[in-house]
Design a protein with these regions (language model features):
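C-terminal PAP-associated
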Residues: 20-197, 201-204, 208-576
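Bacterial Sec-dependent N-terminal signal peptides
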Residues: 1-20
Length: 576
């Protein structure tokens, strides 16, 4: 859920970028525990493919390999979905998020969540709803405070394959009643300061995962009427918060550790990433200005169910940030920093084009958090690009039979920013949506490499635009063989919006998605009630084989009042 504030500070272009940012340390406001290959090393020499225009890297034909295998697909949350807790009733945008474990799949859509079966040791089928649709804040039932009481959307789910745990991150967008002492908003360049704890009595009481009864028609009608009540005035001086829930094992129906961190600034659009030393959660933040929070939560203590810290860097004049999210099981070199990236350009100053991707290195010191470091930004030169539709919240993608166009979120690197280590090779895969020479929209994708000195450089790049249709709002993954898979929305004047998948086999010619397109779901209707389309979506690599890539996205059914979602699993090449 994205918003522009009523007042803006115009953002400077990233080329003019900033000195090292200072750090905000936040103690957990509340916390409790609920009941209940071999390594393939590529020998191809790394070289820069950075120079040239956008057209130089544009792929104008489909790949000649066969498409990725669609192993299974099923209906997720959205219009027409019915599960143990009743029928889906959602709001736009969907804010799709997906996580895959060994025996379960969790999906969150805006303010709702569901748990599905995954064929394996426990279940003999995939895609059967075990839980949901329920409000995402049910994970925090019994915890108390705003994490339990509020449910405004933008919740994101991850599976931490290194520990076999689930992670749910949920922001609170409403200011809370003022406390006796409130944390002061931090500004870029100010000295580090440890923030207050939200509840001196933490950890709170332990409760099992709450499983509600299906709502009655009367309760559903009451919920619909509440949506139409104007929002009450915001209390002056109160803070927001970020809520974390980490399961104590691989069964999502088991117990969870829950945490609340006080945020003095609005915590929009969280994008969690798993890294050995923390859960990295950047947000777009601020109330009357646009800043970025680059935050990290203390993963090891969360996994042990202990009180934990969250530290935040405040960054001015940057695009939407993403931290690298670890795919697979091979760890990065011990103690190496996480890397965070953003596109260039500045929509607020009408700068929609750039020829660089910008990155920072984040080094966390949990023993002495004030010594944590944020280094950067540094520019990686890439082929020129222009934001698809000139950025976010713009009417961009046409649809059949209507003048309503869809938003493309063209100003940002999309979730996830993927990290994969294979032997001594360390890769980062990123995607964003760009204009194309054919007049539609394309998926610009990159594979970066990290050398032994921790320098980041471009290895290959391309813009997938095989025709004049629109391909946008993508999400990438890399499997254990180094194959790259990308799911994305597909549509245009002649095609209702739906979801497709493509990719490439490791070692294929650089800059080309060599696979044909796999259809996940064909759109059946145009979305006419809003321009908002998903805001983001998500891939997930299956931890069971580290090869299968899962993806989720929106589409509309014939006669539907609102979006539906489709979840699918793809495999590139043959399992070895």
């Amino acid at each position: 859920m994205l918003r522009f504030s009523s007042l803006f500070i115009l953002m400077m272009a990233p080329a003019a970028l900033f000195a090292q940012s200072e750090l905000l340390i936040t103690q957990s406001g509340r916390h409790d525990t609920s009941d209940s290959l071999k390594h393939l090393i590529f020998k191809e020499e790394v070289h820069s493919l950075a120079s040239g225009s956008a057209a130089d890297v544009e792929q104008t034909t489909l790949g000649t390999r066969g498409p990725a295998e669609l192993i299974v697909s099923f209906e997720g949350l959205g219009y027409g979905f019915r599960g143990p807790q009743g029928e889906s009733r959602h709001r736009n945008p969907s804010d799709n998020s997906l996580a895959v474990g060994h025996n379960h799949i969790i999906q969150t859509v805006n303010s709702k969540m569901a748990i599905f079966t995954k064929k394996g040791e426990v279940f003999n089928d995939t895609g059967r709803a075990l839980y949901g649709p329920v409000n995402t804040n049910n994970v925090f039932r019994g915890f108390g405070g705003p994490c339990e009481e509020m449910n405004n959307g933008d919740a994101v789910v991850r599976y931490d394959q290194l520990a076999n745990r689930w992670l749910v991150v949920m922001p609170i967008f409403r200011r809370l009643p003022p406390r006796d002492i409130e944390p002061e908003p931090r500004k870029h360049g100010e000295p580090a300061k440890e923030s207050m704890v939200g509840n001196p009595g933490q950890p709170g009481s332990a409760e099992p995962l709450f499983i509600p009864e299906p709502p009655t028609e009367k309760e559903l009608a009451a919920a619909d009427s509440l949506r139409r009540i104007p929002r009450q005035p915001v209390p002056e001086g109160g803070s927001y918060c970020m809520c974390y829930a980490v399961s104590t094992g691989p069964d999502p129906f088991g117990s969870w550790n829950r945490y609340e961190f006080v945020r003095p600034l609005f915590p929009d659009y969280p994008r969690p990433a798993v890294w050995p030393d923390g859960y990295y959660v950047p947000t777009s933040t601020g109330d009357h200005i646009i800043q970025k929070h680059a935050c990290v939560a203390e993963r090891e203590k969360m996994l042990r169910g202990e009180p934990a810290k969250e530290i935040c860097f405040i960054i001015d004049s940057a695009g939407f940030l993403n931290n690298i999210d670890l795919d697979g099981f091979q760890l990065p070199p011990d103690g190496e920093p996480n890397i965070m990236m953003a596109t260039g350009g500045t929509q607020l100053r009408n700068v929609f084009a750039d020829d660089g991707i910008y990155f920072w290195k984040v080094s966390v010191n949990w023993d002495e958090p004030e010594k944590s470091r944020l280094e950067g930004p540094e520019k990686i030169e890439v082929a020129e690009y222009n934001y698809l539709g000139d950025g976010q919240l713009t009417k961009t993608v046409p649809q059949p039979g209507t003048d309503q166009r869809l938003d493309s979120q063209g100003d940002k690197i999309m979730s996830r920013l993927v990290y994969r280590r294979i032997g001594n090779q360390e890769s980062i895969v990123a995607v964003h949506s760009v204009n194309t020479t054919a007049g539609g929209g394309g998926v610009r994708w990159y594979e970066f490499r990290i050398d032994q000195q921790r320098n980041v450089s471009i290895f290959q790049q391309g813009t997938f635009a095989p025709d004049s249709s629109y391909r946008w709002m993508a999400s990438p993954a890399m499997d254990k063989y180094g194959n790259i898979g990308i799911g994305y929305s597909f549509g245009g004047k002649e095609h209702f919006p739906g979801q497709r998948f493509s990719g490439r086999v490791a070692g294929d010619p650089k800059g080309i998605l060599t696979l044909g397109e796999t259809l996940l779901v064909e759109g059946e209707a145009s979305q006419q009630n809003t321009m908002r389309w998903m805001d983001y979506t998500q891939t997930a690599v299956d931890p069971t084989d580290d090869h299968t890539i899962w993806y989720v996205g929106d589409y509309l059914k014939t006669g539907a009042e609102d979006y539906s979602t489709r979840i699918g699993a793809f495999r590139i090449g043959v399992s070895k």
